[in-house]
Regions:
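Short amphipathic helix-loop junctions that connect adjacent transmembrane helices
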Residues: 29-43, 227-246
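Structural signature of the two symmetry-related core transmembrane helices
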Residues: 74-89, 275-290
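Symmetry-related core transmembrane helices of the 12-TM Major Facilitator Superfamily/SLC fold
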Residues: 163-179, 366-382
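A late C-terminal transmembrane helix in Major Facilitator Superfamily
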Residues: 330-359
Length: 398
């Protein structure tokens, strides 16, 4: 990569790291925060968090699609500003609905930043570099998840509000990085070989439909598993043990990703994506079975999380590369925004988890998640078969 492109890439990777440290210090503890400060029941918390996540995903999709028409640097700056506003406001309000509203703003801002970041990489990097940089970005994000939760745990011991101030402070640095090191662009129209911008194309692409539906189910399993597990443990044990489980599971998850993500992700290709996604599905299933029988053993929770994370290590770059493979030039952000609808699965997870834990046997939660990830795997194959798949395409050489 040329020097300017390398500098911009490093600035964006550093921004991802800092934003994720802030999220890692706060997001896993939202359930505990709402329980302690507002004495909400677990099913009510599920509804509240799901509503915030759904609103965030839907608004971020609209903003993300428009990012193909406008300057991506400006989009990133505004999303980080909203991120800071949301985290600064939560400790200052004493009203649960307002907390949910600001939480929705935070999720919208982060989703927009993430979508535009992926589109920025897809527009500017060669096919060989895309898989490597995305896997490196995902590794860096999980370094943030490794650092964030322990810091959040320490801060919560002193004050339930401190993690939110940390998140706001961490987000201030990306503002500087983006302003100094990112160049403005002219939107999709300025890109050579760009397809005419037409959001209606998204509605006609059957492969995109299958991949988005698959992402919906997969994110319902892996996208919010920390809050899902904390809800589960709150019901079967206590809030104190829930804190311990979150403090074990998230660092284990992040450590496995940091160790394996780059090595595995850079080797994904159109030739081997089918067997690798199958292996990832098996890892998800084994991890979920492990969670079901972990009980009071933190060791069992940690081992199950490690196996579960092997599935995540494969699915994360795999889903990105599937979308990049089918997205035409000039519409990368639009396609990634459509894919972000899949995160509605993670958004609905807290609500569905609350309903399941309230009305069904506790162990049935993991059985339902197993069925969901198997269905997601089947939909990936339907999407691949929806259009001619070229093993020798750029994806194969990534």
């Amino acid at each position: 990569m040329i020097t300017t492109l390398r500098r911009s890439t490093i600035a964006l990777l550093a921004s991802s790291l800092l934003l994720t440290i802030g999220r890692g210090a706060t997001l896993p503890f939202m359930t505990i925060y709402l329980t302690r400060r507002f004495q909400l029941e677990v099913d009510v918390i599920g509804y509240a968090l799901s509503l915030a996540l759904v609103v965030g995903v839907l608004f971020s999709m609209g903003f993300g699609i428009l990012a193909d028409r406008f300057d991506k640097k400006r989009y990133m700056v505004w999303s980080v500003l909203v991120f800071i506003l949301g985290f600064s406001a939560i400790p200052l309000v004493n009203n649960a609905p307002l907390v949910v509203i600001f939480f929705a703003l935070i999720n919208c801002a982060y989703s927009v930043f993430s979508t535009v970041l992926k589109a920025w990489f897809a527009d500017r990097l060669t096919a060989e570099k895309k898989a490597r940089i995305f896997s490196l970005n995902y590794t860096i994000l999980n370094i943030g998840w490794t650092v964030g939760p322990p810091i959040g745990t320490l801060l919560v011991m002193h004050s339930i509000n401190l993690p939110f101030w940390l998140a706001a402070a961490c987000a201030a640095f990306p503002l500087v990085f983006i302003q100094l090191f990112l160049q403005r662009d002219g939107g999709a129209a300025a890109q050579p070989g760009a397809a005419p911008w037409s959001p209606s194309v998204l509605l006609r692409d059957r492969a995109l439909l299958w991949f988005t539906c698959s992402g919906l189910l997969a994110s319902s399993v892996g996208g919010a598993f920390a809050s899902c597990l904390s809800q589960y443990v709150l019901v079967v044990a206590s809030s104190d043990f829930a804190e311990k489980v979150v403090a074990v599971v998230l660092p284990v998850n992040a450590a496995v990703v940091v160790a394996l993500q780059y090595a595995v992700g850079r080797r994904l290709s159109a030739r081997n994506i089918r067997p690798l996604m199958t292996f990832g599905t098996v890892c998800f299933v084994i991890g979920l079975v492990g969670f079901m029988f972990s009980g009071a053993s933190l060791w069992a929770w940690g081992i199950s999380a490690a196996i579960f994370t092997l599935g995540e290590v494969i699915y994360a770059p795999g889903e990105y590369m599937l979308i990049d493979h089918i997205a035409p030039p000039g519409m990368k952000a639009s396609y990634f925004s459509a894919q972000s609808l899949g995160w509605l699965g993670a958004a609905f997870n807290p609500m569905l988890t609350g309903l399941i834990l309230t009305h069904l046997p506790h162990w049935s939660l993991f059985v339902i998640l197993i069925v969901a990830i198997v269905a997601a795997w089947l939909m990936i194959f339907r999407g691949i078969n929806a259009r001619p798949w070229q093993p020798d395409s750029p994806l194969a050489n990534a």
